[in-house]
């Protein structure tokens, strides 16, 4: 029996610090399962545990905390990438026997990856071509071509207890709501988490992650319009905020927080708790700016910005119960 489900999702273009939010939730709450519902190894989560930094891509972060994990049926799996990540975690002393994989995940083939390799707006992981074959009903499910080494990891039981779902990418990379076609190949909104095998009525809290400024990797004309790479402040934010993709290593494009897009993402996703991270970076550059109604608003101090931004969000997003500002690189103070 499923008791309740909490969900962590991105509210912008990914890279919002979902990994450290998940880590903090796992430290302070009892979950029976941690489940990944979308994407593949094109995503990347950074987790700090016992003063060490770990990276995961397709395997849910719960594996680092000794919790059972599930890679759900909406995910795309490259067998070689999965094996490499399992070996990486095993080499660091983590129990990979806690991992389960839906038999319905779609397998990324070498031809998928080869086709995707020269796409400058992709991570080159083969996700797009595999997704295309999925909807053409040509992709292979893991249950139909499962290597012997992975058969013991196939999910054969029903989810139960208390579940934490971790999303990949972010709202504005969603295949439907993002600036198509400059998007990812899966649904990034929380409703897609129900594909793991639970009804929507079991969802308890949706945690939405954002940063105090906006970033993205890859081309998007809407983002390019606002991006000002020649500005010294933007360059410094990239360096001070370590704005490099976990998966690609590419520097992220940075611009000021788009308030209207954040509000839309919060309201459509149903976010209850908003976590806005890296607020300390704006103190370093001493600029406190948001974009609202296509006009830039400059605040004198970070505290003023946080206060005014909070007032605006509570007024425009009626489902919000709490807003958390985080400046710590390793964890969030709930």
Q: Which ranges hold each PLM region?
A:
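Non-transmembrane, aqueous-exposed alpha-helical and coiled segments at domain scale
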Residues: 1-334
């Amino acid at each position: 029996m499923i008791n309740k489900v909490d969900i962590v999702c991105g509210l912008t273009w990914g890279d919002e610090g979902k990994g450290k939010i998940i880590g903090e939730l796992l430290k302070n709450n009892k979950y029976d399962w941690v489940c990944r519902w979308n994407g593949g190894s094109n995503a990347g989560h950074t987790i700090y545990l016992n003063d060490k930094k770990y990276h995961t891509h397709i395997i849910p972060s719960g594996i680092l905390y000794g919790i059972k994990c599930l890679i759900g049926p909406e995910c795309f799996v490259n067998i070689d990438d999965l094996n490499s990540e399992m070996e990486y975690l095993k080499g660091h002393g983590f129990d990979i026997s806690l991992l389960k994989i839906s038999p319905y995940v779609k397998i990324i083939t070498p031809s998928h990856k080869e086709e995707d390799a020269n796409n400058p707006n992709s991570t080159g992981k083969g996700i797009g071509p595999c997704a295309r074959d999925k909807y053409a009903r040509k992709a292979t499910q893991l249950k139909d071509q499962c290597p012997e080494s992975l058969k013991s990891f196939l999910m054969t039981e029903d989810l139960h207890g208390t579940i934490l779902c971790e999303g990949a990418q972010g709202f504005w990379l969603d295949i439907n709501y993002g600036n198509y076609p400059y998007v990812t190949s899966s649904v990034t909104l929380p409703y897609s988490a129900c594909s793991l095998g639970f009804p929507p009525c079991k969802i308890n809290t949706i945690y939405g992650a954002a940063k105090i400024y906006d970033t993205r990797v890859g081309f998007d004309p809407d983002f390019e319009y606002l991006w000002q790479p020649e500005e010294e402040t933007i360059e410094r934010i990239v360096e001070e905020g370590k704005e490099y993709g976990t998966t690609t290593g590419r520097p992220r494009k940075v611009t000021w927080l788009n308030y209207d897009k954040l509000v839309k993402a919060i309201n459509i996703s149903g976010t209850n708790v908003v976590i806005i991270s890296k607020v300390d970076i704006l103190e370093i550059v001493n600029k406190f700016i948001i974009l609202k109604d296509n006009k830039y608003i400059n605040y004198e101090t970070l505290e003023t910005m946080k206060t005014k931004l909070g007032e605006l969000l509570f007024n425009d997003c009626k489902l919000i119960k709490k807003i958390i500002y985080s400046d710590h690189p390793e964890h969030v103070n709930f």
